[in-house]
Amino acid sequence: MNTASLSQAEFLRLVRLNPFNAAILERLPDLDVQQGHLVAGALFGTVWNVRSGQPPTAQIRDYDVFYWDDDVSYEAEDAVIRRAQALFGDLNVPIEVRNQARVHLWFNGKFGQDRPPLNSVREGIDQFLVTCTCVGISAHGAVHAPYGLDELASGILRPNPRNHTPGLCAAKIADYTRRWPWLRADGPVINQQRLA
């Protein structure tokens, strides 16, 4: 399978073509959280939109901001969510703010599967369902892409061997290929369990 190449500088340029990404990344340091990152669909979806000739904001369902706080109480996370609403509210797009130290506490209730506690935001990014979607940009502009960016540019969707919930992968890949038909799955896809 041929792959295109994508440098970190070009990735950042493409991501910032989405004005909501640009605004969130500009303001993210002001959220004043540890390990703050803009992650997931806001990033890879923007790249895929640009590569397929769609507007950069097309088909972006929400903008995920991850951070880390050893205080795993709901109240502490809710306080950060409220600060984020004040900081980003004028953008009028759904922004999901989640403390990655808490994921193991709610994951089973949402997805019906247990997962072990994470040790950092980047460990959470490293475990996304599909390897090329394991991307994040820190509050200081550093790109985190443990599998590189070339398969993201090429639209190659591979199940992530580091993910603890592989049964959700088939539904996620089906969703991506429905929204961006030029993408292609590669590697074994496990189970047809539906995402919530």
Describe the residue ranges of each PLM region.
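Catalytic cores of the polymerase beta-like nucleotidyltransferase superfamily
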Residues: M1-A196
